[in-house]
Amino acid sequence: MDEIINKYQAVEKLFKEIQQGLAAYDQYKTLISEMMHYNNHIKQEYFNFLMIISPYLIRAHSGETLRNKVNNEIKRLILVENINTKISKTLVSVNFLLQKKLSTDGVKTKNMWCTNNPMLQVKTAHNLFKQLCDTQSKTQWVQTLKYKECKYCHTDMVFNTTQFGLQCPNCGCIQELMGTIFDETHFYNHDGQKAKSGIFNPNRHYRFWIEHILGRNSEQELGTKQDPCGTKVLQQLKKIIKRDNKCIALLTVENIRKMLKEINRTDLNNCVSLILRKLTGVGPPQISESILLRGEYIFTEAIKIREKVCKKGRINRNYYPYYIYKIFDAILPPNDTTNRRILQYIHLQGNDTLANNDSEWESICMELPEIKWKPTDRTHCVHFF
C-alpha cells in the first residue's frame, strides 16, 4: 500500500516539474494542456484508490491481529483492481506524448542542465517511468504476498476444489481465490453414470449449524408474512414462561424446544439460540475465528471418515449438531468456561440415538487423530453455566 501511495505522489511531483519546465516555452502550450488532462486523470485514480482502502485503514487501528488481516486484504485489492497496471498505462502514455512532441518540435537549448530545459524534464520522466514500471520490481512485490501460506500457522495451503480456494491441512483455514477457475469435469455426468442433483459439501452444513448454534442467523427466520419480526412467537413464549413460573435466566435449549412444540412452531427448532438471546438478553459465546476454522476442518474430516465407516443398515443421515458438540467438547480446554458455554446451545437427541451415535463416533475417532473418543455425558456441561 505504501508503495502505491509513493508512486502516486512521485507521479504528481513529476507532472509538476514537467509543467514548470515547459512553461518557459510558448510552443508547448498545447502539450501542457494535454499533460493537464493526464494529471487530472491520475489524480482521479489516486482518489478512487484512497476511497477503496479507507474503510480498511479505519479497521487497521483495532489491533495487531486485525491490522495484519487488513494489510493482506489491501494487497489483494491492489492486485484485483490492477492499480500498478493503471499507473503504468498512464506513464506510458505520458512518456510517448513527451517523446513525440519534444522530438518533432525540435527546440534547441544552449545548456542541457538548465533548470528550464524541457529535455531535462523528459530525462527525469524517463528515469521515473523505468523505476515505477520495472517488471522485476513488480514481480518481487507480488511474491511478498505469499498467498499460499496460511495466515494462522504459516504452513503451505492445498487446493480445495469444493471450496474453490486454498485450505490449510493443519488448522483448516480456507482462503478463497478470487477470479480462479477450477476444473469441474469431475462434477459432470459421464456415460453410464447417474447424474447427481448436487454436490455434497460438509463445510456448508458446518457453517449453517454454527451460524444457528451461535445465534448469528437472521431474526427474520422467526417471522412470517403476517409477523415479519417474530414478535408474536416471542409473546407466546413469554406467556408460557409466566404461566409456568419459569426463571428466564435459567432457560435451556430443551425448555425452548418444548415450548415451541406446544405452540406448534417446531419449525423454529434451529433458531433456539437466537430465541434464547431474544428472551434472556444473553447469547452464546462468541468463539474466535481460529477455533471455528479448526472445528470446521475436523468436522470435514469426520464426515469424510464417516462415509467410509458408517454401519450398514443405518439410514444415511447425519445429525450434524452432534458432531459439532463432540468436536468442541474435545478441542475446548476444560478450564475455558466461557467458550464451553457453546455446549449448552446444542440439542442432543434421545438416549438410544445418542448411544448409536457414540458407537459410530468411536469408529470415526480411530481414524481421526485430532479427537480422543469419550462417551457423551449430558450433564458434563452443566457446571459451566
Curated annotation (Swiss-Prot):
KW DNA repair (keyword) present: no
Stored InterPro entries: Poxvirus_VLTF3, VLTF-3_Zn_ribbon
Gene Ontology molecular-function annotations: zinc ion binding
Record keywords, A-Z: Late protein, Metal-binding, Zinc, Zinc-finger
Ubl conjugation as UniProt keyword: no
Pfam families hit by this protein: A2L_zn_ribbon, Pox_VLTF3
Zn-finger region bounds: C2H2-type: 166-190
Induction comment: Expressed in the late phase of the viral replicative cycle.
GO annotation terms (biological process): regulation of viral transcription
Family as reported in the entry's similarity comment: Belongs to the asfivirus B385R family.
Name recorded for this polypeptide: Zinc finger protein B385R
